[in-house]
Amino acid sequence: SSQIEKSINNSFNTMIYRLSGSDSPSNIWRIINAGNARKNFIKSYSIKNINNESYLEVSFNKDLLVEVFNKLSIPVISNSRPVMLFLIEIDSGAGEPYYLTHSKNNLELDNLLKNYLKKESSLRGIFLELPELDLVEVNQLLNYKRLIDLEDIIYEKYIFDELIKIKISKIGIDQWSIDGDININIDDKDFVKNFIDKFKEHTNFRINKILEKNQ
């Protein structure tokens, strides 16, 4: 189905990003324009069920991808580059709660967080990633599901060195509650600035720790 094809394409794009360290679509187009269809790189795919939810698991032929990278002179980064995955749930009270992904923007906050992660990632030489949740039945997942259900999927699907979990909820007219790896209440006035400052501080602390460990 078109949903499966879309999920496979997203998984492929993520794999190219992981191998090249660049999220520029030009590498993907170079590979495809050289006559390589995405499906040629698939070893297998299967639909898995966790807690009665479906998601697609795709396995790629990484050796073949590296071979094509070398042919096209696309640099392959070291496999030892650390990966931090951010699972950020946002409930502004204005609509359904949602998880921050690359493909969706709801609030000004979403863009600021993504821009920071992208910039810091290239600056520090570490992957700061968000889950690509259109691989999951997102709407079903977000309706009355506890965070642990999504975590099962995250651990099954992603390889990462550290998982950072944050839940951002508006708890009154003028207050936000932050839970998980950051625990703090913030006033609505200047909320975005104050939260971003706190988020940067925590993320930098975690990046420093993981880089020390990997030296």
Task: Pin down the residues of each PLM region.
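Positively charged, aromatic-enriched nucleic acid-contacting surfaces
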Residues: S1-Q3
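N-terminal segment of the mature soluble domain
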Residues: E5-I31, F86-R146, Y158, L163
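Signal peptide-directed extracytoplasmic domains
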Residues: I28-E89, Y98-Y99
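A short, hydrophobic beta-strand-centered structural micro-motif
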Residues: A37-K48, L85-I88, F127-E132, L142-D181
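Amphipathic beta-strand/beta-sheet edge segments enriched in Tyr/Trp
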Residues: E57, N61-L64, I154-R206
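A short, terminal or domain-edge coil/loop segment
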Residues: S78-L85, E89-Y98, S177-N194
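N-terminal small/polar-rich segments of proteins
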Residues: L133-N139, K200-Q215
